[in-house]
Amino acid sequence: MGTLRFFILLFFSVSIVSAQEYSTILWKAQDKLTWKDFRGRVPVPSRAAATTASGFTYKYSAQRIRGELKVSFAVSTYFYPEKSWYNPSLCDSIILSHEQLHFDISELYARKLKKKLDSKTFTHGSLKKEVKFIYNAVMKELNDYQNLYDKETNFSRDLEEQLRWNKKIREALK
């Protein structure tokens, strides 16, 4: 029946904004955030020291070859500078490290999404629905994990826990 090729390109993001509307910083192991990357306005009133807006997007292409659906995925993690902010009077290097780890955790879950998507066999009729289901499940896990991180470190105030989390995530990203 020949090779029927079709390509689907979808972008989803943790953030409400798309990567095309705002500048983004792509996650790279060797690059670390600086306070200059946090360009959003501090909301009034806010008792928080800083907020990191990060997340991941995915895209995929699919081909039907001899009746079999072959799907290829790409997942990327982004930091959104205009949606991230800090209060200079409350921030120090420990808080910056805490915010960096939020970005790193997003990368960790982007990798989990990629692994889950790559290990799944899809059918043409259910591809979009199944991908979205997996994405939503991983997003829930990510949000729960980010909340656990903040809770256990007390938003970076518990230095011992912060150091434990730094090591834990660094090891997970190796």
Please name every model-derived segment.
Residues 103, 116, 145:
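Short alpha-helical functional segments enriched in proximate histidine and acidic residues
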